[in-house]
């Protein structure tokens, strides 16, 4: 490989929530175990060097005044979308900066719904969506994803349509790839979902922040690409932050083709929160989307695919009673621990604490709307993933 995904990086004291925080009250790591961060969705790999190079090059100039996004910024996004997602016809005017995916979601829901109105989401549900809608006084209506005979998560289109009609919904969130299940939707699935939204006149916001992190053998389909109607009713959100581990630099972008949607989202973004770009974030994106970034992401996908395959097989062979669907994208596992916990007579709280006690810092999955779930991050060097599962096998699931 061209880039290093093997070295174990020491992030302590370097502004890293993943290693500085234990995300479960009352849990502690026992003496003799170091922390293996497997919770918050960022990566324990060094990012592609061109990002640092672009930032350092800009920092070496001693003025940091007001600025506008450069032509290079927009062209970097246009070229990235064309090469990675086969997007044609994208222009700078359709692209808009956002401080984050959730900031754009907040602006969109304020633009197209009123307090007290309902919005449709799928469940399991990314916890960030929940916070946005609760904070903005909107009612969340959940359409459960269901697992087929092979355990693959599927949308229930009849349930979606019924709930949209019952609650008079005109705003829907579509997460593609889906977080936390890791499902990468196929063309026909997206097409059917968009037909439901079209028939019920819903504005759709499509969170595609994970779209670069598709495991090998799968392919991301941009929601806006499945039809002309989808192109015109969808607000799509992307970001280099998830792909290149840049969450601490802040910065994402929307793609909105429909001027009616675009004008309102941009106006509301400026009203509801400070939504101006940081100059270093701009240069980070430009550095990320260079040719070297394409190579880095392709190698990362290979590493993540291997980690997921290892973890999936290990769980099937050693953690009897723990259920999971094999993810097709993201680097997260979403474990259903109900059968195991009930068989052992322990609570999910006790299981989570047992893992943390041996240094496996995993995440309570219940806030994502499944009562026996744990979420695990596999974006670490393979040696750390293997060590985590060794500890879980020896000390927790024994």
Predicted regions and their residues:
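Conserved PLP-binding catalytic core of the aspartate aminotransferase-like
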Residues: 304-305, 318-357, 374
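PLP-dependent enzyme catalytic core of the Aspartate aminotransferase-like
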Residues: 344-346, 353-398
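PLP-dependent aminotransferase class I/II
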Residues: 233-317, 323-327
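Short strand-turn motif at the edge of the Rossmann-like AdoMet-binding core
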Residues: 208-210, 239-240
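Conserved core of the PLP fold type I
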Residues: 60, 64-195, 212-213, 220-225, ...
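N-terminal small-domain helix-loop-helix segment of the aminotransferase-like
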Residues: 2-100, 107, 291, 398
């Amino acid at each position: 490989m061209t880039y290093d995904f093997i070295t174990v990086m020491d992030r302590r004291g370097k502004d890293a929530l993943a290693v500085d925080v234990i995300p479960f009250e009352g849990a502690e790591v026992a003496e003799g175990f170091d922390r293996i961060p497997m919770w918050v969705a960022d990566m324990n790999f060094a990012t592609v060097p061109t990002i640092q190079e672009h930032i350092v090059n800009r920092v070496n100039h001693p003025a940091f005044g007001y600025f506008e996004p450069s032509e290079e910024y927009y062209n970097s996004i246009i070229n990235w979308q064309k090469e990675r997602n086969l997007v044609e016809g994208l222009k700078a005017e359709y692209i808009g900066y956002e401080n984050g995916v959730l900031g754009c979601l907040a602006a969109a829901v304020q633009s197209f719904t009123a307090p007290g109105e309902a919005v449709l989401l799928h469940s399991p549900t990314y916890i960030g969506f929940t916070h946005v809608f609760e904070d903005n006084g909107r009612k969340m209506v959940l359409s459960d994803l269901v697992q087929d005979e092979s355990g693959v998560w599927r949308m229930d289109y009849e349930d979606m349509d019924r709930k949209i009609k019952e609650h008079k919904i005109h705003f829907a969130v579509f997460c593609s790839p889906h977080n936390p299940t890791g499902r990468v939707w196929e063309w026909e699935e997206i097409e059917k979902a968009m037909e439901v939204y079209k028939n019920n006149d819903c504005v759709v916001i499509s969170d595609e922040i994970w779209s670069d992190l598709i495991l090998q053998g799968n392919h991301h389909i941009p929601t806006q690409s499945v039809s002309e109607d989808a192109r015109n009713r969808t607000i799509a959100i992307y970001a280099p932050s998830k792909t290149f581990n840049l969450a601490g630099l802040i910065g994402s972008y929307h793609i909105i083709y429909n001027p009616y949607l675009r004008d309102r989202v941009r106006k509301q973004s400026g009203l509801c929160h400070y939504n101006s770009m940081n100059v270093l974030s701009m240069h980070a994106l430009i550095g990320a989307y260079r040719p070297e970034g394409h190579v880095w992401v392709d190698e990362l996908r290979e590493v993540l695919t291997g980690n997921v395959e290892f973890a999936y097989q290990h769980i099937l062979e050693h953690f009897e009673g723990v259920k999971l669907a094999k993810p097709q994208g993201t680097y997260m596992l979403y474990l259903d621990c109900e059968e195991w916990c009930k068989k052992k007579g322990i609570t999910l709280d006790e299981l989570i604490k047992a893992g943390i006690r041996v240094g496996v810092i995993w995440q309570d999955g219940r806030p994502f709307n499944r009562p026996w779930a744990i979420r695990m991050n596999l974006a670490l060097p393979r040696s750390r993933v293997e060590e985590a599962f060794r500890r879980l096998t020896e000390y927790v699931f024994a």
